[in-house]
Amino acid sequence: MQTGPKVNDLIAVILIPDKLIVIFATVYAYPVLGMKKTSQLKSLIASPGLAYLMEAHNGLSAKIVEEAGFAGIWGSGLSISASLGVRDNNEASWTQVLDVLEFMGDAVTIPILLDGDTGYGNFNNMRRLVRKLEQRDIAGVCIEDKLFPKTNSFIGGENQPLADMDEFCGKIKAAKDTQSDDDFMVVARLEAFIAGWGLDEALRRAEAYHNAGADAILCHSKKTDSTDIDAFMKEWANRGPVIIVPTKYYSVPTAHFQNLGVSTIIWANHNIRSAVKAMQDTTRRIFEDKSLINVESKISSVGELFRLQGADELKEAEKKYLPTSGKKVNNIILAASQGSLGELTRDVPKTLLEVNGKSLLATQIDEFNRVGIKDITVVRGFAKGKI
């Protein structure tokens, strides 16, 4: 299992007279213990090998991504909006997205790069967004050069107007001037290929965004082959890190992109899509069968959910912080009232009424005993001889 981003495959070339010995190995970069999340992401994207970010859309999926071995997370706008039941058209407010990100960030130790759409407004919105992301320990943000409110790139992309290039450069500069952490990443996403403008416009904008301070360029394409990416990488000539999202051209081997010099690949929406398929199949089966027989063995156990939620840690914390049996605790149960329940309490106090074959008083005593409270005083009154 991959547990870190690949740094390089070529380790050494040894020259001996009449011989050339090349040593290959797979090396992975591990986050240094205590390294800031921003520094982790910056190191990941700047590494000489091909790195990967996996999509997550809530705290649970973020934890699953980290446990799988990924070194970074893509906070997908499409996936977060879908998980909230709305369209990927800025229908979820940026503060609602921040709420989701806060849970995601708390759940993991690896960095998150937010899909920040268009920055949720102009340069001023961008400044506030960066401040709020840094407060939540989010490692970076990617913004795309389209107009607010955005539309997903795979829905009628040719009809989506691009943002004014100079205005978008202003957003990038505002973000970089606002960040308080030097390692916070601002990624500029090119939509020129999506909108049908072609290579020249993509290169013109990429150069402008790079000069404005973008830490990396995300080159987006909806073709089913990699010709857009191939052409861009050839002309870009390693002027800065390039990130790609091969959702549509998934059949192209990742080794091809490593050879091109691509920095990072984002698997952009596959957790939400797999979750949707699994939920549809399970829900349909339960509805049709009116039974759980055919699904129970195919879904996660309740225990696995508890594990992912950190139930064991809570148990240990309870032992540490909750009162123990070593500390004497007294309890008084007031059982003197007859109550006003008619014939039910004509001869007995209401505390002796039974539920499921057990009196209310006995149930109370058992519950106190269960949490270690043994010193219990019962105050009697009506029909006290029966208690």
Where are these regions (language model features)?
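Conserved N-terminal catalytic core of the sugar/cofactor nucleotidyltransferase
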Residues: K327-I333, G339-S340, R346, L353-E354, ...
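Alpha/beta enzyme core
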Residues: T38-S39, A51-L53, H57-N90, W94-I110, ...
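Extended, intrinsically disordered, low-complexity segments
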Residues: L41, H270-G326
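Catalytic-face loop-and-helix region of soluble metabolic enzyme cores
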Residues: D106-L113, M233-S291
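Extreme N-terminal basic, low-complexity initiation segments
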Residues: Q2-D9
